[in-house]
From Swiss-Prot:
Binding residues for substrate: F50, I51, I52, Q53, H54, Y112, R116, T253
Biological process annotations from GO: L-tryptophan catabolic process to acetyl-CoA; L-tryptophan catabolic process to kynurenine
EC number(s) from the headed UniProt entry: 1.13.11.11
Family: Belongs to the tryptophan 2,3-dioxygenase family.
Key word Metal-binding present: yes
Record protein name field: Tryptophan 2,3-dioxygenase
Residues annotated to bind heme: H239
Species in which this protein is naturally found: Saccharopolyspora erythraea (strain ATCC 11635 / DSM 40517 / JCM 4748 / NBRC 13426 / NCIMB 8594 / NRRL 2338)
Function: Heme-dependent dioxygenase that catalyzes the oxidative cleavage of the L-tryptophan (L-Trp) pyrrole ring and converts L-tryptophan to N-formyl-L-kynurenine. Catalyzes the oxidative cleavage of the indole moiety.
GO MF annotations, alphabetized: heme binding; metal ion binding; tryptophan 2,3-dioxygenase activity
Phylogenetic placement of the source organism: Bacteria, Bacillati, Actinomycetota, Actinomycetes, Pseudonocardiales
Subunit organization: Homotetramer.
Cofactor note: Binds 1 heme group per subunit.
Pathway: Amino-acid degradation; L-tryptophan degradation via kynurenine pathway; L-kynurenine from L-tryptophan: step 1/2
Length: 281
């Protein structure tokens, strides 16, 4: 019998899943939902929020890294249009990550201080996936690998990305193969070092912007990369402000100076020439 304010189950809905792959099995929900283990004693109500916030961030970072590596592979094979698809997806994930800070911002200083001491030296600064994304976007910093010496898998991943070309490196190399004038010094540079502003690249991008109709996919890629960097900065800023409203000017659990350290990250750039060209157009 169907009562009011209810929806009857359709006859073809699968009811017996004993021999079928179920939703929970496919997503490994038994493991996923058993991965939240508060360390506070007695267990603090808000620690679950804190854990889930960071775990979901790590899941999204995993997807971003997956998409950026694929985009880089496409660029290396001169497949610009498929790479644009990956970059577009990354941008949407970035929007989700930035907005997600509003959930953690519901944690007040008075609530957080009640379990912060149980976190020891663990810190979001130690997120190897976040560092991996910075590396693949060109923010190379070999010193950062020291933080992951205890984790063989993470250290190997980051060391590999440190020595590999960034997404930006591969994009500029693609432009070179298409006949655009790229400085030899850029093509031959040590990709394990951070990319710094190269004024000789600006005329290249100016030419693309001023002949957009003839270079539409390259023009679109330039704008996608600017969007990506801008979104990254939005995320960094929301991170900074969430930390500031939660712990003020206290030092981070990982030993950093906290807010002032995060503020300096706002000065880091991935694609400085794509911003500089705007002054020249």
């Amino acid at each position: 019998m169907v009562h009011g304010n209810s929806r009857p189950l359709e006859k073809d809905v699968v009811r017996d899943l004993r021999r079928e792959l179920s939703y929970g099995q496919y997503l490994r929900l038994d493991r996923l939902l058993d991965a939240q283990h508060p360390v506070s004693e007695p267990e603090h109500h808000d620690e679950l929020l804190f854990i889930i916030q960071h775990q979901t961030v790590e899941l999204w970072l995993k997807l971003i890294l997956h998409e950026l590596r694929t985009a880089r592979e496409h660029l290396a094979r001169d497949e610009l249009k498929p790479a644009l698809k990956q970059l577009a997806r990354v941008k949407h994930v970035q929007h989700t990550l930035t907005e997600q800070w509003s959930v953690l911002a519901t944690l007040t200083p008075a609530e957080y201080v009640e379990f912060r001491g149980f976190l020891g030296r663990s810190s979001g600064f130690q997120s190897y996936q976040y560092r991996a994304i910075e590396l693949i976007l060109g923010n190379k910093n070999a010193e950062m690998l020291e933080v992951f010496a205890h984790d063989e898998f993470a250290h190997e991943l980051l060391n590999g990305l440190l020595k590999e070309p960034s997404v930006y490196d591969e994009f500029v190399r693609l432009l070179h193969r298409r006949g655009h004038d790229v400085p030899a010094a850029f093509l031959q540079r040590d990709v394990s070092l951070p990319h710094t502003f190269t004024p000789e690249l600006v005329p290249l991008f100016r030419g693309i912007y001023e002949t957009a109709a003839e270079n539409w996919d390259a023009y679109e890629a330039c704008e996608e990369l600017v969007d990506l960097e801008e979104n990254f900065q939005f995320w960094r800023f929301r991170h900074l402000k969430t930390v500031e409203r939660t712990i003020g000017l206290k030092h981070g659990t990982g030993g950093s100076s906290g807010v002032s350290f995060l503020r300096r990250a706002l000065e880091l750039t991935f694609f400085p020439e794509l911003y500089a060209v705007r002054t020249e157009i």
